[in-house]
């Protein structure tokens, strides 16, 4: 089983979640799990993943969204 890097960006204002995600994708070749609060942040993280040639899968959580980038 592969350890998954987690970026907890809940409660942060844009563009912080995107910047933290970009940094994690730059440093991690494996999967990255990003936690965000707002729907537009989820969409931005998914778009960033797609732009980097990675696949993103989102699920709604109690306090926002979890986006797993592979």
Which ranges hold each PLM region?
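C-terminal edge-of-domain segments
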Residues: 56-70
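Amphipathic alpha-helical interaction surfaces in cytosolic regulatory modules
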Residues: 16-23, 39-52
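Short, structured interface segments that constitute the first stable element of a domain
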Residues: 1-2, 36, 41
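An N-terminal amphipathic alpha-helical segment
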Residues: 1-28
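Intrinsic-disorder/low-complexity, polar/charged segments enriched in Ser/Thr/Lys/Arg/Asp/Glu/Gln
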Residues: 4-6, 31-33, 64
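Short glycine-rich, basic-tinged beta-strand/loop micro-motifs
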Residues: 25-37
């Amino acid at each position: 089983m592969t350890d998954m890097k987690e970026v907890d960006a809940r409660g942060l204002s844009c563009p912080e979640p995107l910047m933290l995600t970009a940094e994690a994708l730059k440093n991690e070749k494996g999967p990255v799990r990003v936690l965000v609060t707002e729907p537009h942040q989820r969409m931005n993280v998914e778009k960033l993943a797609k732009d980097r040639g990675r696949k993103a899968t989102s699920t709604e959580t109690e306090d926002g969204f979890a986006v797993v980038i592979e």
